[in-house]
Each structure stands twice: as C-alpha cells, then as structure tokens.
Amino acid sequence: MKSSVEKLSDTRSKITVEVPFSELKPEIDQAYAALAQQVQIPGFRKGKAPRQLIDARFGRGAVLEQVVNDMLPNRYAQAIEAEGIKAIGQPNVEVTKIEDNELVEFVAEVDVRPEFELPKFEDITVEVPAIKADEEAIEAELETLRARFSTLKDHNHKLKKGEFVTINITASIDGEKIEEATTEGLSYEIGSDDLIDGLDKALIGAKKDETVEFTSELANGEHKGKEAQISVEITATKQRELPELDDEFAQLASEFDTIEELRESTVSDVEAKQKNEQAAAIRDEVLAAALGEADFALPQSIVDEQAHSQLHQLLGELAHDDAALNSLLEAQGTTREEFDKKNVEDAEKAVRTQLFLDTLSEVEEPEVSQQELTDHILFTAQSYGMDPNQFIGQLQQSGQIANLFSDVRRGKALAQAICRVNVKDSEGNEIDPKEYFGEEEVAETESEA
C-alpha cells in the first residue's frame, strides 16, 4: 500500500491511498464467500459456487464493490497512522480508481488537529482569591443554615428588604390592561429584583392592604420595551423568623449536641469549600492563560458539530420544541440571534480547549489506571442519575469508553502541567499547586468524586 498527504489547510488534509490487488486477497475471498451465500446454483452446495459463476450471476462489479467497501475503513486507518495524521471527525472518502487485478485508489479528506507550540508552563503566573475562613465567612455560612430552618410570620409594619409579600399585579398601557403582565396571588421576596424593574422600590415602606403604583418598561411579551403603568395590591406581608444560634438549634440542624461543635465543624466546612474553590480557580486561570498563548486555527466542521450538539442537548430538555426555546430566550431578555452567536462562541471555546488538552496529553504522557477510569465512569453515571452498570453497558454499546478515558487523560495532563505554574493568592502569598494537583491529590480527588 502506498499513501501520500497533501495539506489543504492548517486543519484539513487530503490523503491519497493506492492498494494493490495483491494485498486484497482477504477482502476478495470474503466478498465471494458473502455473494455465494446469496445464490443457489444447481450442482453446487450453497456457498460453494465457483467464482466464475458468481461473476456471471452478479457481475464482477458487484464483487469489486464489496471488496472496496470492506477494505476502506482498515486501509484508511493504516494510512493515517503511517502518515502520522492526527485526524478528527469523519473523513470524506472518494474512490478515484479501480483497476481490476491491479489496484484500488481512494482519496480521503479529513479535519486534522492543528499543530502549535505549547506554552512553557514554568513561565505562567496566575493569581487566585486567598482563602479567608474568617469570622465573616463563618457567620455567613451559619446564617445560611439558620435561613433553612426559618419560619415566616405575618406582620403589619412597613415593608423592608428581605421580607415577603403576596401581591396582585396589574399592568396597563394608556388605560388598556395588559393580560400577559397581570397576575394574582404572587409570592415575592423584596430585594430579589427578579420580577419588574422598580417593584422593590415601590414596596419598601408600604404596608399590607395598600396599593402602590409606578411606571416600568415591560421586559417581555408583545409589548416588550413599552412603558406601562403598574399597580400592585399587597394582600399579605410576612417576615422571616430565624432560630437562635444555641444548642437546641445545633441539635435540630446537625448531628452535633452543642453550638460550639457546630461552629467548629462550620469552620472546617468553610475552609474545605474555599480550598475547592481555590483549586478550581487555579485550574481555570492556568487553562485560560495557556490557551491565550497558544495560537491555532479551529476545524470549522468540528465547531459546527459541537454547536449543533449543544443546541440539540438544550432542545432535548425542551422536548425538541423550537418555539419553546424562543419563548425561554424571550423570558431571559435575549434574542435567538444573540443565543446562536453565544452558542457558536461556546462551541469554539470547547473545541479549542479539547484540542489544546489533546496536544498537552501527548507531551505530558500521563498514565491512566483502570481504577481512575472506573472512578470517572462511576462519577459520570452519578452525575447523570444513572445506574452504573446500565451506564457502562451504554458506553460499551456506543463505543464511548475511549472518550471517558481521554477525559481522564486530559485532566491528568493539565494537572501535571499546573504543578509547574507559579501561583499567588490575592494577598501575595505563594501557593504550591502540588498541594492541589500533585499525583496523590489528583488521585484522591478523583476517588472522592
């Protein structure tokens, strides 16, 4: 077999392959055997008809077509391996020549991983937020816990931020009621600022059974962007009542008997949470810095495929209802054009990151153990809410286990590279990235995941 490569662009190559008939005996034998099973010729057992009779019945062209179909995948794989082509995606293959008993020639065009220089991670410096398990952070965590066990009590004083109301809202333009912006019995927390612009300001200082009025620009619907008169009737007012931070609360909200024990545990929880956040920040900052120094083109077809996959996944959550997506975008205050643009940008970022990490993996050459792969599969199954055995069965059926192996390999390659980066926190303290990304730490994290 002979092959040659023509570089079409930084991200696409054309491979021309010639396969002599002398190398195609297994495929020829297989083609005749398959066709022989399809015909019953008097005087011969099924599957034992001579080749000249099969040629006469089906034509030599049918045999050659079967041979070509059988040989293409294997010979293509051999050619790109021999030429060192880092192919991504499916090739476009065209058989350009069939000379019976001489050779078969085909041409394959395929997207390839672009070549580029990796940055020197030793020269990268990043800054991440400092860990501050101070009293303020601890109190904030305890307040969050108190809020989970709070109760709502009726009151009749002037409303304040953080209190709750039940309201009826009526919107009108030039005296005409806007049905789509009108609702009754709506529960709302003052200060959440996620309903109507100006609502919080109007409610603060008001009392139960009062009606407040103001003007606001409608954010959604047929009258989006128009000024409307808003009338809000306050039918109920409530305030949050928090439990005392005492031993009784500790026993109610945790496994501890005293508030001192709960506070000590909260300190440890805050420190662990901030360490996890700091590790994630290091990873994100290093990856962003490294990608910023690596200049390479992206295969457009791969970007298009990624963008389509992202859109398909989102539509799947909406029962593949395109109109529902447009309604969702309108409720979020964005347009389909803006969404499509961001979807492509996200796809480009995802493809760029994967191509970068694939190249980094080849340089770092991390080893992935069976246990690491198993842990990652179990973690992924858990994130999808699937039974691990069922998930593994689906992976085997679809041939996706190799993809998860690559995910683990990319993560380990990046961890190895991060260990060479200079890291400081926002207070100027040096951080040893090996504390988070050393071999033992990475293995422990994956095991816990």
Swiss-Prot record:
Domain PPIase FKBP-type per the UniProt entry, residue ranges: 162-243
The entry's keywords: Cell cycle, Cell division, Chaperone, Cytoplasm, Isomerase, Rotamase
Biased composition (Basic and acidic residues): 428-437
Region (Disordered): 428-449
Biased composition range(s): Acidic residues: 438-449
GO biological process, one term: cell division
PANTHER family registered for this protein in UniProt: TRIGGER FACTOR CHAPERONE AND PEPTIDYL-PROLYL CIS/TRANS ISOMERASE, TRIGGER FACTOR-LIKE PROTEIN TIG, CHLOROPLASTIC
HAMAP family attached to this UniProt entry: Trigger_factor_Tig
Name this polypeptide is given: Trigger factor
Biological source species: Corynebacterium glutamicum (strain ATCC 13032 / DSM 20300 / JCM 1318 / BCRC 11384 / CCUG 27702 / LMG 3730 / NBRC 12168 / NCIMB 10025 / NRRL B-2784 / 534)
